[in-house]
Amino acid sequence: RLLHGRHRHDYNWALTSRHKRDIALDLNQAAGRDVLHQLVAQADVFIHNFRADQLERYDLTFDRLRSMNSRLIYAQLTGFGTQGPDSEKRGYDTTAWWASAGILDLMKPGVSAPMFPVGGVGDHASAMSLFGGIMMALYQREKSGLGDCVETSLVANGAWSNGMHLQGAIAGFDLGAVLEEKGYRSPFAMIYETSDHRFVVLVSPNPQKE
């Protein structure tokens, strides 16, 4: 509701959930958990974005569900992974994918504050990564007969999306210092405002070949 406000259609739900059957369950109640367990027993894939404490509370750990269905593909998408000091933090597109992976910092002009990003970009990119893991697990199941657990996180996919700059930092290349020393970005890769107040995005990294 925060995203679509008073609009008569929940267009976010329509984008990601069209043509899907749905059911609402209260997992805080034993009856709700029982229904979900019945569904899991005959499912191919179970996808969730719960933290470890929630999985324990709702009786949805990998070992528990695998005991009900040995062929189940258990897929999880978290904010900051399942191990490490941030694993129990709530993760959102803005905080984990955009901010923690350094993408927000790269997009801000000069020393100004980062702009608040649009929502859903990192969510969708990370979902495709999880989809790839699920498909590989299904392929493996055809050979082994057994399910498996696959996982990814928003921060991991943000790091991959920002991989060129992070790899540069690991190698000792400081893009910010280079831009500060030059005082400008490349004129061949820049956004220019036109006389009629529109904008042209120019990307010509190799002028000799253009």
Feature-to-residue mapping (PLM):
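Short beta-strand->loop
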Residues: 118-125, 152-154, 202-203
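Hydrophobic residues in beta-strands and at strand termini
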Residues: 25-27, 154, 194
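Glycine-rich beta-alpha junction loops
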Residues: 79-81, 154-160, 196-198, 204-209
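Alpha-helical interface/anchor segments and their boundary "cap" residues
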Residues: 172-210
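N-terminal helix-loop segment corresponding to the beta1-alpha1 unit
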Residues: 1-146, 178
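Substrate-binding/catalytic subdomain of NAD(P)-dependent oxidoreductase enzymes
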Residues: 138-178
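Active-site-adjacent beta-strand anchor residues
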Residues: 26, 48, 152, 201-205
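Residue-level detector of beta-strand structural context in well-folded domains
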Residues: 12-14, 150, 190
